[in-house]
């Protein structure tokens, strides 16, 4: 699912809201999550999961084409840990061995 599909589904479930208003709300939520992560804050949505930033130290890498060693700078990467309720629902709705689909 892409963001526009998410906006459309939320608008369909809330006919009293205009789709452009839903889009503005979704964008505002995502912007606030990104801003909080940029400040170094952790964002926790109970039952859904928690967003945080992990810091990767500088390291020595290798150019796969030439084999030459190259320095890789330290970097910050976003990290998401699912909440307990989400994990339970995913495991209940998609038992082990069931085929995954990209719907």
UniProtKB/Swiss-Prot annotation:
Disulfide bond annotation, renumbered to this chain: none
Source taxon at top rank: Bacteria
A single GO BP: regulation of translation
Record's keyword terms, sorted: DNA recombination, DNA-binding, Transcription, Transcription regulation, Translation regulation
GO molecular function list: DNA binding; structural constituent of chromatin
Classification via InterPro entries: Hist_DNA-bd, Histone-like_DNA-bd_CS, IHF-like_DNA-bd_dom_sf, IHF_beta
CDD domains: IHF_B (cd13836)
GO cellular component, one term: chromosome
Entry's family note: Belongs to the bacterial histone-like protein family.
Function: This protein is one of the two subunits of integration host factor, a specific DNA-binding protein that functions in genetic recombination as well as in transcriptional and translational control.
Subunit annotation: Heterodimer of an alpha and a beta chain.
Protein name: Integration host factor subunit beta
Organism: Bradyrhizobium sp. (strain BTAi1 / ATCC BAA-1182)
């Amino acid at each position: 699912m892409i963001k526009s599909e998410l906006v459309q589904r939320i608008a369909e479930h809330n006919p009293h809201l205009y789709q452009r208003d839903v889009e503005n709300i979704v964008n505002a939520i995502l912007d606030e999550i990104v801003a909080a992560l940029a400040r170094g804050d952790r964002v926790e949505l109970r039952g859904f999961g928690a967003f945080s930033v992990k810091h990767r130290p500088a390291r020595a890498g290798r150019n796969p084409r030439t084999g030459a060693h190259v320095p890789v700078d330290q970097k910050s990467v976003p990290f998401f840990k699912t909440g307990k309720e989400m994990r339970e629902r995913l495991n209940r709705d998609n038992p082990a061995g069931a085929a995954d689909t990209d719907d």
